[in-house]
């Protein structure tokens, strides 16, 4: 068996949570491979809305095995709150959720360091979510992090050493903080965390594959936030691309099967950083309002713009995407004209590739297509699609070179239409 990978192709917030929930009936296992509680996956079904930050989206599907891999960073306090809320709503976790011993822990002082570093940068700040993700990955790379498995052996000593080191840094930054409340909730989270199955996820995933089980790897954020390939330095601290599934779960590259790439019919971004197609007019405001574009974790208003096919082609290439999934098509239902960025103009020169140094000065070159101006939210099959919408799909497929297999026409899991079903 091979593992299939599901990931975002833009700047995050593409709708991965809903898609995982739609796809999971086909899989035995759902595994998160990177990121932390800075990104929320939103799912809606049966009139209920759920936001998952650390727990895999397969948790709503029967007896699936859900794995938090070694590439994930975990905040015990936030994990406890998330898990308890799920259990209270009738979704038991303890027998179905396995956590890698090698996953790194976000310490209370990591969150304070995150705020201190952002404050020190002034106008050059990245716009982090303040959840301590960057400092945690920094400790991981510098070989001084505290891992989930450490909670079982000499934990007090390891935690105290990391805390003391962080407090020295905070002292040098002259940053005032109050650790007591954060630490209290965090230590309670550690005790709660110990109630779950700690595993060597690399062995577990490979043994499941050997036993013929199907595995879906769930990414967080999006390709354009990847630490290596995103719009650096306005990126996250982990590899959000397909290769991150290998390092974040311990599976070999030749075990990768299908790669599902998710994108919105338009484009959004949260926080600072270049965004070539960003709209500052009524059109952008309309996208934001109709798409309810506010961060599921931070509540921050998302920046909105037309779809960027230069960046999207780049993402498809890097990830080896085999199937595309388009989200939030319904948000564009009332637009008379649809625009798509097909090239950039940089210093007067037109380019069709994503450059090394993408700056705020990049000017988008647009193709224009007629809007479908039809309410698609109640449609059940692609046979009902308006002619103009089909033309938009065809245009995107020609530009990207990959079929769009799934189209979302609303937030509920039922508002999902599969295409090419005869194949």
Predicted features along the sequence, with ranges:
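Non-transmembrane, aqueous-exposed alpha-helical and coiled segments at domain scale
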Residues: 1-423
């Amino acid at each position: 068996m091979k593992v299939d990978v599901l990931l975002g192709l833009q700047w995050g917030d593409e709708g991965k949570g809903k898609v995982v929930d739609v796809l999971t009936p086909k899989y035995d296992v759902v595994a998160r491979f990177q990121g932390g509680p800075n990104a929320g996956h939103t799912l809606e079904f049966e009139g209920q809305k759920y936001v998952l930050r650390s727990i895999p989206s397969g948790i709503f599907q029967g007896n699936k095995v859900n794995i938090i891999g070694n590439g994930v960073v975990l905040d015990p306090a936030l994990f406890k709150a998330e898990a308890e809320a799920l259990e209270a709503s009738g979704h038991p976790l303890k027998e179905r959720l396995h956590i890698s011993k090698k996953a790194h822990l976000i310490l209370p002082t990591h969150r304070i360091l995150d705020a201190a570093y952002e404050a020190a940068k002034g106008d050059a700040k990245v716009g982090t979510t303040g959840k301590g993700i960057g400092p945690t990955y920094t400790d991981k790379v510098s070989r001084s992090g505290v891992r989930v498995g450490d909670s079982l052996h000499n934990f007090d000593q390891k935690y105290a050493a990391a805390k003391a080191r962080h407090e020295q840094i905070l002292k040098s930054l002259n940053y005032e903080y109050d650790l007591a409340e954060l630490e209290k909730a965090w230590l309670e989270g550690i005790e709660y965390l110990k109630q779950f199955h700690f595993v060597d996820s690399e062995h577990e995933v490979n043994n499941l594959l050997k036993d013929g089980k199907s595995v879906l790897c769930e990414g967080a954020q999006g390709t354009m936030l990847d630490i290596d390939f995103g719009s650096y330095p306005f990126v996250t601290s982990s590899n959000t691309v397909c290769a991150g599934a290998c390092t974040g779960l311990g599976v070999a590259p030749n075990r990768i099967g299908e790669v599902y790439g998710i994108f919105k019919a338009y484009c959004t971004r949260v926080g600072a950083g270049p965004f070539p197609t960003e709209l500052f007019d009524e059109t952008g405001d309309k996208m934001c309002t109709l798409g309810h574009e506010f961060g599921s974790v931070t509540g921050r208003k998302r920046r909105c713009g037309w779809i960027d096919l230069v960046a999207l082609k780049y993402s498809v290439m890097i990830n080896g995407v085999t199937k595309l999934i388009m989200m939030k098509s319904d948000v564009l239902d009332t637009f008379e004209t649809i625009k798509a960025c097909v090239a950039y103009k940089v210093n007067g020169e037109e380019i069709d590739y994503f450059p090394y140094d993408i700056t705020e000065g990049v000017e988008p070159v647009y193709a224009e297509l007629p809007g479908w101006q039809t309410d698609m939210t109640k449609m059940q099959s692609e046979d009902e699609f308006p002619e103009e919408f089909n033309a938009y799909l065809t245009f995107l497929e020609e530009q990207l070179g990959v079929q769009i297999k799934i189209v979302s026409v609303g937030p509920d899991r039922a508002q999902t239409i599969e295409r090419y079903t005869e194949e």
